[in-house]
């Protein structure tokens, strides 16, 4: 099973259906792209990248990096590189040039794509231009225009199931990112399972077509996997980014939004003040929040608008999806996929299956520590209920260990703080031997009486807690708490 092979089967099935909604960056006009047209573009991009591959010395690996905002051309070149036998390496477009070049040197990236917004920064562009030989630093817009003029490659490279086709930086809230190698089999598992599950619905003509808007970054596994999953369902997507999202939100009557929780929170806040945004949200039936946990406040806000909140469980190391099946349940991450299995070992969630990464690039020690006896140890704490639903309860490395040997789970305390409707964001941590909490509240930032209500809530909460768990220091922030690139609160 290979990624390109699975996508070919999907495209052949839905050939005439709409696959993508695209916005022209110059005119702002929208256009519709069918599955067949999309795959023609991917095949043409594969021709372009095949020629680029031939231009490399034999001993140089064929890897293509990118630092750019989300867009349809980004995704086409993403697949075009893989279909030409290359390894795609998406990097966070907000990285400075120094950090981009640091990872490029560590991984070995002979070609680097860059977005127009990134190259508009003259200092950034100058640093990358100085580091790359002529013809190796490539503007994304120019590459897409050139690849569209190429003849489609008839024999796309499929490779072997264990071939590395994607390298991603592991996401986290602390420490240096590790480089994850995802294989053909890893990336194929989810879209293939979704596609096969829907075969009866396709044959009976009962398959509904949904229009989706996705804004999760393509440098993250949570950006690409939902796209191929929706394509497997025969649905269409508009790939948006933070710069264009509000404009794109009103482009169609989208039934599903695929976003980070922090982004969804901002949309709902805007809808409270803007009747037009509130009207746009009336067509939305479901919101899939990935990249970070949804707070109880956000879940309730979605319910209040008759929008179904959904979340899946997965990591970069598990190629995104571990759980996604079953009807929604508040607080749960659905049930496990058929292509993998999970177990709880000493409270830790462990995963084994086709979606588990090959390993960390040039880091056998970290790989051996993470994958033991075939099981990937996620570092997340959780439980599985009698119906197979997974609940994530915390992160092992976040556990606060006090000098008296007592263990305190910050996530458990954070859930208790979120019971206060005034709390929008919170992080619990240790300050010496005391438990502390940082809280952001929109209401409290504007009204001191609301801040006093939060303090009173925490005081009352402490009366119900063991002494070691009581929150001794409370900091109310007037600004949102710091987050990583996928919206996870930093600790």
Q: Across the structure, where does each feature detected by a protein language model lie?
A:
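Conserved pre-ATP/AMP-binding loop-to-beta segment of ANL
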Residues: 15-18, 151-169, 175-176, 201-211
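Conserved AMP-binding A3 loop
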Residues: 32-35, 157, 165-192
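Conserved structural elements of the adenylate-forming
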Residues: 39-47, 161, 180-204, 215, ...
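Conserved AMP-binding/adenylate-forming
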Residues: 48-95, 214-215
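Conserved AMP-binding/adenylation subdomain of ANL enzymes
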Residues: 188-211, 218-256, 270-275
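Gly/Ser/Thr-rich phosphate-binding loop
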Residues: 232, 254-259, 268-330, 341, ...
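Conserved ATP/PPi-binding loop(s) of AMP-dependent carboxylate-activating enzymes
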Residues: 308, 328, 335-338, 346-370, ...
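AMP-binding/adenylate-forming catalytic core of the ANL superfamily
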Residues: 353, 358-359, 381-467
């Amino acid at each position: 099973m290979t990624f390109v092979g699975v996508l070919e089967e999907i495209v052949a099935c839905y050939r005439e259906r709409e696959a993508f909604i695209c916005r022209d960056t110059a005119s702002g006009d929208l256009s519709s792209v069918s599955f067949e047209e999309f795959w023609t573009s991917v095949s043409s991009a594969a021709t372009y990248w095949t020629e680029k591959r031939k231009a490399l010395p034999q001993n140089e690996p064929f890897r293509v990096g990118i630092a750019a905002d989300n867009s349809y051309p980004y995704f086409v070149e993403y697949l075009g590189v893989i279909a030409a036998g290359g390894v795609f390496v998406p990097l966070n477009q907000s990285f400075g040039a120094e950090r981009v070049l640091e990872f490029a040197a560590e991984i070995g990236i002979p070609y680097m794509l860059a977005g127009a917004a990134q190259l508009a920064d003259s200092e950034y562009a100058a640093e990358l231009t100085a580091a790359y030989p002529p013809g190796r630093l490539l503007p994304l817009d120019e590459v897409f225009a050139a690849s569209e003029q190429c003849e489609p490659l008839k024999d796309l490279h499929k490779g072997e199931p264990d071939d590395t086709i994607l390298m991603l930086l592991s996401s986290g809230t602390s420490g240096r990112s590790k480089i994850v190698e995802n294989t053909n089999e890893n990336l194929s598992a989810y879209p293939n399972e979704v596609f096969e599950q829907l075969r009866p619905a396709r044959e009976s003509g009962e398959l509904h077509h949904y229009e989706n808007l996705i804004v999760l970054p393509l440098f993250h596994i949570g950006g690409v996997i939902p796209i191929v999953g929706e394509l497997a369902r025969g649905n269409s997507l508009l790939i948006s980014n933070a710069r264009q999202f509000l404009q794109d939100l009103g482009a169609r009557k989208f039934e599903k939004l695929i976003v980070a929780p922090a982004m969804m929170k901002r949309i709902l806040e805007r809808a409270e003040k803007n009747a037009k945004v509130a009207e746009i949200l009336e067509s939305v039936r479901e919101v899939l929040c990935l990249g970070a946990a949804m707070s109880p406040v956000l879940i309730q806000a979605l319910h209040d608008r008759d929008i179904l909140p959904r979340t899946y469980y997965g990591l970069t190391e598990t190629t995104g999806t571990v759980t996604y099946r079953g009807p929604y349940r508040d607080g749960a991450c659905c049930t496990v996929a058929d292509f993998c299995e999970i177990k709880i070992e000493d409270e830790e969630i462990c995963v084994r299956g086709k979606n588990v990464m090959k390993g960390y690039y040039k880091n056998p020690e970290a790989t051996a520590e993470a994958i033991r006896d075939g099981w990937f140890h996620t570092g997340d704490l959780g439980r599985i209920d009698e119906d197979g639903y997974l609940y994530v309860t915390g992160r092992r490395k976040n556990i606060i260990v006090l000098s008296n040997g007592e263990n305190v789970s910050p996530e458990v305390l954070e859930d208790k703080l979120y019971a206060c409707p005034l709390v929008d964001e919170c992080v619990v941590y240790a300050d010496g031997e005391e438990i502390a909490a940082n809280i952001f509240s929109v209401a409290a930032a504007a009204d001191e009486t609301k801040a006093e209500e939060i303090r009173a809530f925490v005081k009352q909460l402490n009366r119900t807690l063991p002494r070691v768990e009581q929150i001794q220091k409370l900091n109310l922030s007037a600004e949102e708490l710091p987050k990583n690139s996928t919206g996870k609160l930093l600790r």
